[in-house]
Amino acid sequence: MHTIDVVYSDTAKVNQFYGAMYRASFLPREMSDCNGDYPEFSTGITKHIDPSLLSLHSSLKKYGDFSMWDIYRAQLPLYNIVVPTLSGRMMQSLVDMYQEGGWLPIFPCWNSYTAAMIGDHCSVALADAYAKGVRNFDADKAYEAMRKNAFETPKSFAEYKNGMGRRALESYLRYAYIPLEDSVKEAFHTCEQTSRTLEYAFDDFAVAQMAKMLGHDDDYN
């Protein structure tokens, strides 16, 4: 909270600002214990990291409960500016989720994939972090995950139902939008096609920018 010093005559406004900063630190939260144990993403199986490595390489710490649809616009970009090292640890946790579960999550909460909300905003978070100079995460593996979400769908309905991959991606790739006639199976709301299209368009912009920054010119073009 002391990363930003505010000097202003209205103490109520200053208190309001720091109160907001404090609340912005609640989530995402650290999932790894001090002894090195952490629950593997999507399975909950206990994994272990040598505590001595945790003290030497804090990037190994695991973070979870990314209410992504709510935080990708403001909170995470703020982290990139004021606590970039912490942001990198969180971005690496997203990459780890992809490696452990096979897909970059849409809305990772309760240490699991969920089908909550629309969009694919982990891609935006990762691209924004890299664009702002955050480097303590595996950007190449992050891009691999982002690209997979943008072009592939789960092979089984069980995976799709569990929240893996983008919903209605087939229609989106075919038409460049999601028509109202696509009922979007397992969606919380059945009339969100326009909103989903807009969110995916922004997500794809982020994927394209990541491709450009990493030198994947064919993908970018």
Q: Residue spans of the language-model regions?
A:
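Acidic/polar, glycine-enriched structural segments that form the non-catalytic walls/loops
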Residues: 1-62, 96, 103-106, 135-136, ...
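A conserved hydrophobic secondary-structure block that centers on an alpha-helix together
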Residues: 4-10, 61-65, 71-77, 81-104, ...
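Short helix-capping and inter-helix turn/linker motifs at the boundaries of alpha-helical repeat units
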Residues: 11-12, 52-53, 65-68, 116-117, ...
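Extracytoplasmic/secreted proteins, especially bacterial periplasmic and envelope-associated proteins
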Residues: 12-19, 73, 86-89, 93, ...
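Alpha-helical support elements that line or immediately flank enzyme active sites
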Residues: 19-33, 70-87, 127-132, 205-216
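Short, mixed-charge, low-aromatic patches
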Residues: 45-49, 80-84, 182-185
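A generic structural signal for ordered alpha-helices
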Residues: 52-56, 65-68, 72, 104, ...
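Active-site cavity-forming subdomains of large catalytic enzyme subunits
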Residues: 98-221
